[in-house]
Amino acid sequence: MTNITVENIIAYSKIADALDIEKISEKAPGFMYDPNEFTGLTIKLNAPNVAILLFPDGKAICTGAKNLDDIDFSIKEVVNKLRRIGIKIKSKTDIEIQNIIASFDLGKELNLSSISKALNIENTSIEQDKFPGLVYKMDELGATLLIFSSGKIVCIGVKKLEDASKAIEILKEKISTLEI
């Protein structure tokens, strides 16, 4: 299995039927709210280093996590803070992963033009005047791989760590068979 680095996991949970963002911002120190900038409320945690965004529809979005335990802990932490100030929260809150961003370094320089030609043209996009990498879509895994000439690969769009690892492993195998 490929040794990938998780850069960010984004997840959400429906923690309430509705949240009075203004009321929460008045009662909860440390929660940031500026209705002119953003309709939601933000709280940043230091351990783990994540941000939780709260929305009027009762959704909580967690971003910045490096692992699934950090997401679970962070959402529970915010739920507990909300309960302590009298906010009605659902008794059971499921967490759904929306996106995992992971990276891997092949450790060698890559010729993106050659790779683009060798891979399925329908699944690749290279416009180096607009973006310095090759965009390769793996629809079967829901993954998009950003491939850079430095050999760094960034995988986005997956909802499981195994899928990120599998997508990068498939790409590594394809690149290793190319005569470039």
Model-found features: residue ranges?
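Intrinsically disordered, low-complexity polar/charged tails and linkers
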Residues: 1-144, 150-152, 158-180
